[in-house]
Amino acid sequence: VGAASFEAIPLDQIERIEILRGPASSLYGADAIGGVIQIFTRRGGSSLAANASVGYGTYATATGAAGVSGTSGPVRYSLQAGGRRSDGFNAIANPANFSWNPDRDGYETANVTASASYDWAKDQSLGATYFRNRLDNQFDASAGHDDRTITVLDAWQVESRNRITPAWRWSIVAGRTADDSKSSTEYGEYDYRTRDTQYRWQHDIVLPAGDLSLAYERREERLTENAGFAVTSRDTDSAIAVYRLVSGPQALQVNVRHDDS
């Protein structure tokens, strides 16, 4: 519960990565006490655009990706797909290692990302995003078995962003991530299935002096596995308040967050 399969996110689907350094727990939860890494996938631009790429390298590594994105009136869209495979190399080269296996340890992955947004009025928009990736990865854990892990990552999100008054905006976001992982070794098979559902309602208000953000967040985490973990579920309700004031070269920020798990 609470883990993420970063290895299942393909590089060709990433638009940019932003690193926020310093305490960020008030906005992102207790795990962000030292900062956060935000990964943004591709979205539609202001005009129609298509992209495609292929590659080939050592260990019979091949990669390909293609996509289209653009804007049509009030609708912005993006569709990206790609894949990558490699024969790999022997992960453990020392025959004296008890996990040594003379085979190559390769991988195969395929992914698709789709997103769309609709501006139904000025400063009023609806949006949705879907992502899926399948990763089949070989590794060495025993001498006589084709050890491998298959991970399927599914994620979707819907959102509504609205300006209520010139000084007041809100956003409502709901999403779910499903992470299914199955490892096969000589010693047995291990299944992990996680479901992470999140809801967030945030208000951003411009005050006569500074800005105020208020938010309510709920996170529901579920784990199904065959390893016998003691804790397989967690629900967290969070209340968040952030006040920001900038005056010339001086800046003040006050953060308050309460989590109830």
Regions found by a protein language model. Give the residues of each.
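Non-catalytic regulatory/gating segments with a bias toward low-complexity or hydrophobic composition
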Residues: I17-E18, I37-I39
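Short beta-turn/strand-loop junction motif enriched in small, turn-promoting residues
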Residues: G22-S25, H258-D260
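Extracytoplasmic
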Residues: D12-I14, A32-V36, S47-A49, T63, ...
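Short, glycine-/polar-rich solvent-exposed loops and beta-turns at beta-strand/coil boundaries
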Residues: V1, G29-I33
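Short acidic, glycine/proline-rich loop/turn micro-motifs
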Residues: V1-G2, A49-A50, N90-P95, F139-A143, ...
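Face-selective signature of the C-terminal outer-membrane beta-barrel domain
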Residues: S117-L135, I150-S261
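Periplasmic-side early beta-strands and strand-to-turn transitions of outer-membrane beta-barrels
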Residues: S25-S26, Q38, G45-S47, S53-G55, ...
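Short acidic/polar hinge/loop motifs at secondary-structure boundaries
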Residues: V1-R21
